[in-house]
C-alpha cells in the first residue's frame, strides 16, 4: 500500500473533497459528499445507474470523439490505435491496455513516445473473464480503453497527479455527472513490470476509469512491496489512465446490461434469428437482467458459481432458478456471441490466423466457444455473417477489403470444428470408460488436455460422459482458465555471463563485401577470441555465423563459430595461442557469406511475394538460412496450392529482375515505427533504442542480417517444397543464386535420367509416363485375373490335400514363393469351403504365415490368431488377427516348414487330438 501523502492533492483540497474510509471495505476514497459512508465500489455500493443514467445518452462513436476532442483541446496529441495483436512485444500476444502500446521501450525511457502528452482510444482484448461474458451483464472480451498518457522525466515534467485528476473531473462534469456522485478510491496498481499509486473513478457503483501514477519498476531488491512483488523508483514517471469507452456508454444509457448498450442492433438481429423474444420495454423482463447485473457486480464471479448467482436472483424476484435459467440462458448466449464476434472482427481484421499456438490459439478458442453457443441456440447462419455485421459497424476500410479472406478463414474453422465434434465423442467415450472403471469423475486436467490437444469442447465431454453415467469436473470459468495459460509468451531464461569487454565494432554492417580486416585481440572469454573490431557475422536472426581465419605473423587460426553476447562478438577458434594485444588479420569465407546474404535477402522477397499472392494476413513465423537453401515459415489458414506456389515464385523472381536497391540503415525505433509500422517486427522484436531497418522494395523489416545491395545480385529463386509445420503455419523451402541453379540442375538430371530410361525426349515424358501408367494398370488387371485363376486351380489342389482332424478339415502347406496377398486370397477361398488353412510362403527374403478358420473350425473353438502366434516363433517373428483370419511374419525363411508344423500342432491341440 502507498502512504496517505501520495494522494494528498492540491486539487482535492481546493475543490472541497474530503478523504474518507469506507465503512464496508476499509478502503480510502475522496468525495465532495461529506456525508458519504461508502467508497462507491461494488460490493460496497450496488449499481445505481441502471434505469437511472448518470449523464446524457451517448453512442460508442460520439463518446469516443467527445473524449479525444476534449483532450486535444487540452493540449494532447491524438494518436491512432495500435493493432490488437501486440507485434511490438515478445512477452504478450494481445494488446491488453493502452499502456501496453508503449511498453517496454517508451515506459523504460529507451524510446521517446509518439507524442507527449497524448490521447488514444485503444481496442484491447482480455480473455481472463471469458466465461463471465454474457452472464455478468458487464464483462467484455474486447473493449476500447480511452486514455491520456504523459511521460515525465526528472528534467521535464508536463503534468502529474493534480492535473490528471483535474482533467478527469472536468470531463465528467462536462458530460453532466453529478459532482457529489463521483468518488476517487485509492488503490495500488501493478502491471507489465511497473507499479504506482492509482485512483479508481467511480460513479453510480460503476468504475468508469482508473488513473495510474506509474513511478515504480520491478526490482527484486526494491524498497516498495506491491501485491507481493518488490519495486524501486523509476527515473521517469508516467501518467497511465484508462477510461472504459463501453462503460461510459452503458452509464449514459442505464440499460440492464452493457451488451444492450453497446450492441443493440446485433443483439436484436441475433434474438430474431434465434427466435428469442427480448423485450426490454417489458418492466418485469428488464428487471430480471438488471438485477442480474447488479448482483453480479456485487460478487466475484471467479469464486461464486453461476448456480449460486441464479439462486440469489431467483429468490429476489420470487421465482425458481429453473425458470430463471430458461429466461436468461438464451439471452446470455446471444450477448456472448455479440461480444465474441466483435472480438473476432478485431483479431482477424488485425491479421491473427487461428491455430493451435500463440495468438492463433486464443482466436480459435473464441471461435469455437462462439460456434458452441450458436449450436445451442440453433442459429442457422454462418459465423462469418455475424462477424461481417460487426466489421460493417467498425470504421476500418482495410478490414472490409479483407472480408473475403476473413470469411474463408471462418468457414474453414467451422468445418474443422464439425470434424472435431465428430471425433470428440469417440475419444471422450474411451476416457469416460476408463474413469468409470476407477469409480471417479473426469478431472479438470483431463478436460483441459482434451481441449488443448484435440480441440474438444468441455461441453461435449460433459454430454458424452453424462450419457455413460460419468460425471466431469467442469468449473464455470473453464475457458478463462484455458485462456490464462495461453495469454503470455513463454519467457526462456538463458543464463549467460556477460563478457567484460567493450562492445565490438561491427564492420560487417558497413563493409559487407570486404573479405579482410585488421584487428587487435582484446582478450579470451570462455575459450573464444574477442577483438576490438570484426567482419565476422555472429549467428543470429536465423542466419548462421561466418567462418574464416585469423592470421598472426603467418600462423593461421581457423574460426569455426561466431556468437555475440551483449554486443561483444566471440570468435571460436580451433587452435590456441592468441593473447591480448596481438594484432591479427581476419579473412572471411566469402563464398559462405554471399550465399547467406543471397538467401537472407531472398527470404525478405519471398515473404513479401507471399503477402502479395496469399493476402496481407501473412506474417513471418520463423526463418532459417544456410549456404544451400533457406526456409520461411508464414502464417496462413490453409495449405498453399501448386498454383499459388508458382505465383509466389514468379513474383519473387520479378522482384529480382527489377534490380531493386536493398537499403539498410540504423534508425531510432520511434521514427522507424512511425514511418513503417509494426510490419518491422516480422522477424522478431530487437532490443534497444536504435534498430537496423532493411528495405527491399515494399518489404521493410528490422533485421540484423547480411544482405546483398541489389536484388539482381540474388540470382534465381527456386521454391523447392512446402510443408505444414503446425496448424496455421506453412513452411516454404527455397534456394537462391548458385544454390538455386544447383537445385534446378539436380532436377534436370532426374528428368534426363527418366527420359533416357524411357528412351523419349524430355518434352514427351509426361505423355509417355501417362501411357506407361495406363498400360501398367491394364496389365495389373490382367495379372489380378490370372492370380485368381491360379488361386482357383491351387484351391482345388489344396482342397484335395485337406485332412480330417476330429471333424474339422485342415490343410497345412508351404506355398513356396508367394506374397502375402496371394496367401490371403487362397486362405480366404479355402475357409469359404469350410476348410481351415495354415499356409506359409516367402517373398522378398521374408517368411509369411496366414491362417484362416472355416465355419466348423470356429464352432469347435479354433482361433486363427492363436495358431499364427504358435507358428510365427519359428520364423523369428510374431503375428495376430481375428479368430477367423490372422497372419504373421518373420525374417527366418528356413524355419517356414517348422512353423507350419507348429501351426498344425496348435490346431490339433485345440481340437483335443
From Swiss-Prot:
Enzyme Commission code(s) on record: 6.1.1.7
Q: Provide the cofactor list for this protein.
A: Zn(2+)
Q: One GO biological process from the UniProt record?
A: alanyl-tRNA aminoacylation
Entry's localization field: Cytoplasm
The record describes how the cofactor is bound as:
Binds 1 zinc ion per subunit.
Q: Alphabetically list the UniProt keywords.
A: Aminoacyl-tRNA synthetase, ATP-binding, Cytoplasm, Ligase, Metal-binding, Nucleotide-binding, Protein biosynthesis, RNA-binding, tRNA-binding, Zinc
InterPro entries attached to this UniProt entry: aa-tRNA-synth_II (IPR006195), aa-tRNA-synth_II/BPL/LPL (IPR045864), Ala-tRNA-lgiase_IIc (IPR002318), Ala-tRNA-ligase_IIc_anticod-bd (IPR018162), Ala-tRNA-synth_IIc_core (IPR018165), Ala-tRNA-synth_IIc_N (IPR018164), Ala-tRNA_lgiase_arc (IPR022429), Ala-tRNA_ligase (IPR050058)
Which N-terminal residues, if any, form the signal peptide?
A: none
Report which reactions are catalysed by this protein. tRNA(Ala) + L-alanine + ATP = L-alanyl-tRNA(Ala) + AMP + diphosphate
Instruction: Output one GO MF annotation.
Output: aminoacyl-tRNA deacylase activity
Say if the entry is tagged with keyword Zinc: yes
PANTHER family attached to this UniProt entry? ALANINE--TRNA LIGASE, CYTOPLASMIC (PTHR11777:SF9), ALANYL-TRNA SYNTHETASE (PTHR11777)
> NCBIfam families attached here?
A-tRNA_syn_arch, alaS
- What family classification does the UniProt entry report for this protein? Belongs to the class-II aminoacyl-tRNA synthetase family.
**Protein role:** Catalyzes the attachment of alanine to tRNA(Ala) in a two-step reaction: alanine is first activated by ATP to form Ala-AMP and then transferred to the acceptor end of tRNA(Ala). Also edits incorrectly charged Ser-tRNA(Ala) and Gly-tRNA(Ala) via its editing domain.
Copy the domain comment. Consists of three domains; the N-terminal catalytic domain, the editing domain and the C-terminal C-Ala domain. The editing domain removes incorrectly charged amino acids, while the C-Ala domain, along with tRNA(Ala), serves as a bridge to cooperatively bring together the editing and aminoacylation centers thus stimulating deacylation of misacylated tRNAs.
The protein, known as: Alanine--tRNA ligase
- The organism is Methanothrix thermoacetophila (strain DSM 6194 / JCM 14653 / NBRC 101360 / PT) (Methanosaeta thermophila)
- Which taxonomic lineage is given here? Archaea, Methanobacteriati, Methanobacteriota, Stenosarchaea group, Methanomicrobia
Amino acid at each position: 500500500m502507498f502512504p496517505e501523502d501520495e494522494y494528498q492533492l492540491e486539487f482535492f483540497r481546493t475543490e472541497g473533497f474530503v478523504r474518507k474510509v469506507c465503512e464496508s471495505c476499509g478502503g480510502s476514497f475522496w468525495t465532495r459528499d461529506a456525508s458519504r459512508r461508502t467508497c462507491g465500489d461494488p460490493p460496497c455500493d450496488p449499481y445505481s445507474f441502471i434505469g437511472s443514467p448518470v449523464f446524457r445518452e451517448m453512442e460508442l462513436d460520439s463518446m469516443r470523439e467527445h473524449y479525444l476532442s476534449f483532450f486535444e483541446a487540452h493540449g494532447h496529441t491524438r494518436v491512432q490505435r495500435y493493432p490488437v495483436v501486440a507485434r511490438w512485444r515478445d512477452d504478450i500476444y494481445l494488446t491488453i491496455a493502452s499502456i501496453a502500446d508503449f511498453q517496454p521501450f517508451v515506459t523504460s525511457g529507451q524510446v521517446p513516445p509518439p507524442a507527449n502528452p497524448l490521447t488514444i482510444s485503444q481496442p484491447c482484448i482480455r480473455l481472463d473473464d471469458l466465461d463471465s461474458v454474457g452472464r455478468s451483464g458487464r464483462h467484455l472480451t474486447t473493449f476500447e480503453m480511452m486514455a491520456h498518457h504523459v511521460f515525465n522525466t526528472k528534467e521535464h515534467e508536463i503534468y502529474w497527479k493534480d492535473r490528471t485528476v483535474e482533467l478527469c473531473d472536468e470531463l465528467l462534469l462536462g458530460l453532466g455527472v453529478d459532482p457529489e456522485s463521483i468518488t476517487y478510491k485509492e488503490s495500488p496498481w501493478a502491471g507489465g513490470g511497473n507499479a504506482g499509486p492509482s485512483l479508481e473513478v467511480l460513479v453510480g457503483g460503476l468504475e468508469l476509469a482508473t488513473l495510474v501514477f506509474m513511478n515504480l519498476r520491478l526490482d527484486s531488491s526494491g524498497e516498495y512491496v506491491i501485491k507481493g512483488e518488490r519495486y524501486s523508483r523509476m527515473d521517469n514517471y508516467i501518467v497511465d489512465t484508462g477510461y472504459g469507452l463501453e462503460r461510459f456508454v452503458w452509464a449514459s444509457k442505464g440499460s440492464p446490461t452493457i451488451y444492450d448498450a453497446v450492441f443493440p442492433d446485433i443483439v436484436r438481429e441475433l434474438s430474431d434469428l434465434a427466435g428469442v423474444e427480448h423485450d426490454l420495454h417489458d418492466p418485469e423482463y428488464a428487471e430480471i437482467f438488471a438485477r442480474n447485473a447488479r448482483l453480479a457486480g456485487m460478487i466475484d464471479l471467479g469464486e461464486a458459481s453461476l448456480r449460486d448467482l441464479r439462486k440469489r436472483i431467483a429468490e429476489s424476484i420470487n421465482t425458481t432458478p429453473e425458470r430463471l435459467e430458461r429466461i436468461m440462458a438464451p439471452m446470455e448466449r446471444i450477448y456472448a456471441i455479440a461480444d465474441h464476434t466483435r472480438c473476432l472482427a478485431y483479431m482477424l481484421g488485425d491479421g491473427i490466423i487461428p491455430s493451435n499456438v500463440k495468438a492463433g490459439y486464443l482466436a480459435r478458442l473464441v471461435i469455437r466457444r462462439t460456434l458452441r453457443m450458436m449450436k445451442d441456440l440453433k442459429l442457422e447462419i454462418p459465423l462469418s455473417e455475424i462477424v461481417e455485421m460487426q466489421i460493417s459497424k467498425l470504421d476500418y476500410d482495410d478490414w472490409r477489403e479483407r472480408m473475403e479472406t476473413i470469411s474463408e478463414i471462418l468457414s474453414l474453422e467451422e468445418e474443422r470444428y464439425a470434424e472435431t465434434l465428430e471425433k470428440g465423442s469417440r475419444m471422450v467415450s474411451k476416457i469416460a470408460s476408463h474413469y468409470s472403471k476407477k469409480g471417479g469423475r473426469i478431472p479438470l486436467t483431463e478436460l483441459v488436455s482434451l481441449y488443448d490437444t484435440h480441440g474438444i469442447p468441455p461441453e461435449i465431454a460433459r454430454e458424452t460422459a453424462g450419457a455413460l453415467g460419468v460425471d466431469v469436473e467442469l468449473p464455470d470459468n473453464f475457458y478463462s482458465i484455458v485462456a490464462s495459460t495461453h495469454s503470455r509468451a513463454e519467457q526462456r531464461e538463458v543464463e549467460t555471463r556477460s563478457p567484460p569487454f567493450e562492445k565490438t565494432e561491427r564492420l560487417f554492417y558497413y563493409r559487407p563485401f570486404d573479405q579482410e580486416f585488421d584487428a587487435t585481440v582484446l582478450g579470451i572469454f570462455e575459450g573464444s577470441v574477442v577483438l576490438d573490431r570484426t567482419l565476422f557475422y555472429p549467428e543470429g536472426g536465423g542466419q548462421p555465423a561466418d567462418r574464416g581465419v585469423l592470421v598472426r605473423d603467418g600462423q593461421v587460426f581457423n574460426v569455426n563459430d561466431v556468437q555475440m553476447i551483449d554486443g561483444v562478438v566471440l570468435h571460436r577458434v580451433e587452435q590456441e595461442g592468441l593473447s591480448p594485444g596481438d594484432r591479427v588479420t581476419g579473412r572471411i569465407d566469402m563464398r559462405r557469406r554471399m550465399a547467406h546474404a543471397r538467401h537472407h535477402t531472398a527470404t525478405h522477397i519471398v515473404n513479401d511475394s507471399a503477402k502479395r499472392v496469399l493476402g496481407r494476413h501473412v506474417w513471418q513465423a520463423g526463418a532459417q538460412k544456410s549456404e544451400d537453401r533457406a526456409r520461411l515459415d508464414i502464417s496462413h489458414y490453409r495449405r498453399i496450392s501448386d498454383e499459388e506456389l508458382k505465383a509466389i515464385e514468379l513474383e519473387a523472381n520479378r522482384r529480382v529482375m527489377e534490380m531493386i536497391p536493398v537499403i539498410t540503415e540504423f534508425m531510432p525505433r520511434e521514427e522507424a515505427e512511425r514511418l513503417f509500422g509494426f510490419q518491422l517486427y516480422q522477424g522478431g522484436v530487437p532490443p534497444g533504442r536504435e534498430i537496423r531497418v532493411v528495405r527491399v522494395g515494399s518489404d521493410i523489416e528490422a533485421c540484423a542480417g547480411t544482405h546483398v545491395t541489389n536484388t539482381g545480385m540474388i540470382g534465381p529463386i527456386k521454391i523447392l517444397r512446402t510443408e505444414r509445420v503446425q496448424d496455421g503455419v506453412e513452411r516454404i523451402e527455397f534456394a537462391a543464386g548458385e544454390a538455386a541453379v544447383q537445385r534446378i540442375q539436380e532436377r534436370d538430371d532426374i528428368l534426363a535420367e527418366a527420359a533416357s530410361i524411357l528412351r523419349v525426349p524430355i518434352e514427351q515424358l509426361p505423355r509417355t509416363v501417362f501411357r506407361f501408367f495406363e498400360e501398367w494398370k491394364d496389365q495389373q488387371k490382367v495379372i489380378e485375373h490370372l492370380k485368381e485363376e491360379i488361386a482357383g486351380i491351387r484351391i482345388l489342389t489344396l482342397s484335395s490335400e485337406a485332412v480330417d482332424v476330429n471333424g474339422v478339415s485342415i490343410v497345412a502347406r508351404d506355398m513356396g514363393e508367394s506374397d502375402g496377398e496371394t496367401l490371403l486370397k487362397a486362405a480366404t477361398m479355402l475357409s469359404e469351403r469350410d476348410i481351415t488353412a495354415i499356409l506359409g510362403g516367402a517373398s522378398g527374403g521374408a517368411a509369411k504365415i496366414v491362417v484362416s478358420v472355416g465355419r466348423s473350425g470356429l464352432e469347435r473353438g479354433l482361433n486363427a490368431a492363436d495358431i499364427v502366434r504358435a507358428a510365427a516363433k519359428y520364423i523369428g517373428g510374431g503375428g495376430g488377427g481375428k479368430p477367423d483370419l490372422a497372419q504373421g511374419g518373420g525374417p527366418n525363411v528356413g524355419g517356414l516348414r517348422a512353423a507350419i508344423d507348429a501351426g498344425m500342432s496348435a490346431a490339433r491341440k485345440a481340437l483335443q487330438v
